[in-house]
Each structure stands twice: as structure tokens, then as C-alpha cells.
């Protein structure tokens, strides 16, 4: 940063309704004060309002900011905006959610969790609590798994990480497993070895119609 110049950054969050994003903005406040810059936090009413967020991103880019912070509700919906950032020389930092196949040179930094590993760790910690139930069940066992959405890369990775690790653990104990429910997660699952009707364990995956 150069002295005597004003720097303002648009920061695109996924929603203003969740306390998660309120906490994130407190971190933005702290960093902005330390660096002597300002930022404008913007975001849709809910994480399901994908088109609204895309419009906000495009409006922010049109103002030629010095940089853009982005947590995309739907990673596939922002590819065009990212290409515009490349064309205009606007650096983008993604946070919370990385963006697969982002245009080359658009994203200069990602700040996010290893979401696949986070989902895997959740399965590893859950399995001991249900292992005996699965081993001793007289019939089919259903494991419910609910994901916030099927559009955000971070949520996709967490859900898939959980499902695939759970499949691995179930099969290691000699049981068969099937995955049913949301199409994205069913297709992303690896290692399921049975049809639903024949499986010892069924992982039932759901995604709500609306996300706040």
C-alpha cells in the first residue's frame, strides 16, 4: 500500500443472516483498521440468492476497485465475473470458498479450510458412536447426512469428504453401503458398493430448498 492513497475493497459475503458472516466481518474490521484501508461488505439476503450476489459482484467490478474479496454462493456462477477481473487487472482473494477452474490469474490467494479433510474428520469422529449399531443391526441402517447446499465448493467438499470417509469406514468393517438422495453428492461419492435395496447401510443425503 502506498501512503496518501485511499484504498477501498468490496468484500462479497454469502449472506448477512448468518452469525458466521457477522464474525467474518469483525475480522475485516480489525484488518482494515490495522492496514489503514476501508472496505464495503456486500451480500445477498440468503445464500440461496445466487443471482443477487452475481449482480452485486458485477456492479462492484464495474467500479474498478483495487481488489475484490469474494465468498461465492455458487462457484460456477462467478466464472464470467472472474474473467472480467482478469481483463481489468483486478486481483481477487477468495475466502471461505475456493473456486475450482477459476480463470487463470484471477484468484491471487485463497483463504479457506481444507474442507474435504474437515468432512473426513467429522466422519471419523462420528463412526465410533454408530459402529456397534451397524455391526449388530438386524436390518438396514440409514445414516442421514444434510448439506447446506450443493453449489458452494466448500460445502460440496465437506459433504463429499464426510460421505467418502464414512463409506471407507463402513466397508473396512465388512458391510456394504449405498448412497442415495441429492444427485450431486450421489455422483461425487466414491466406493459405494451396493444398490440401495441390498445395502447393509444407506447414506441418505439431503439439501434444503432454501439456505439463509
Model-derived regions, located:
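A residue-level marker of the well-folded mature domains of exported/periplasmic proteins
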Residues: 1-212
Amino acid at each position: 500500500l502506498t501512503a496518501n492513497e485511499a484504498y477501498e475493497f468490496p468484500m462479497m459475503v454469502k449472506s448477512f443472516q448468518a452469525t458466521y458472516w457477522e464474525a467474518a466481518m469483525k475480522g475485516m474490521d480489525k484488518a482494515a483498521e490495522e492496514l489503514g484501508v476501508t472496505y464495503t461488505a456486500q451480500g445477498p439476503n440468503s445464500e440461496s440468492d445466487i443471482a443477487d450476489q452475481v449482480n452485486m459482484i458485477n456492479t462492484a467490478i464495474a467500479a474498478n476497485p483495487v481488489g475484490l474479496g469474494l465468498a461465492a454462493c455458487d462457484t460456477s456462477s462467478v466464472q464470467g465475473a472472474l474473467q472480467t477481473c482478469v481483463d481489468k487487472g483486478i486481483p481477487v482473494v477468495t475466502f471461505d470458498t475456493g473456486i475450482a477452474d477459476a480463470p487463470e490469474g484471477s484468484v491471487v490467494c485463497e483463504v479457506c479450510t481444507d474442507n474435504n479433510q474437515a468432512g473426513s474428520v467429522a466422519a471419523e469422529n462420528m463412526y465410533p458412536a454408530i459402529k456397534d449399531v451397524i455391526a449388530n443391526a438386524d436390518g438396514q441402517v440409514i445414516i442421514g447426512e444434510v448439506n447446506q447446499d450443493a453449489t458452494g465448493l466448500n460445502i460440496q467438499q465437506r459433504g463429499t469428504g464426510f460421505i467418502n470417509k464414512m463409506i471407507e469406514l463402513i466397508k473396512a468393517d465388512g458391510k456394504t453401503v449405498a448412497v442415495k438422495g441429492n444427485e450431486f453428492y450421489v455422483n461425487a461419492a466414491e466406493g459405494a458398493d451396493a444398490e440401495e435395496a441390498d445395502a447393509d447401510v444407506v447414506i441418505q443425503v439431503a439439501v434444503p430448498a432454501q439456505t439463509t
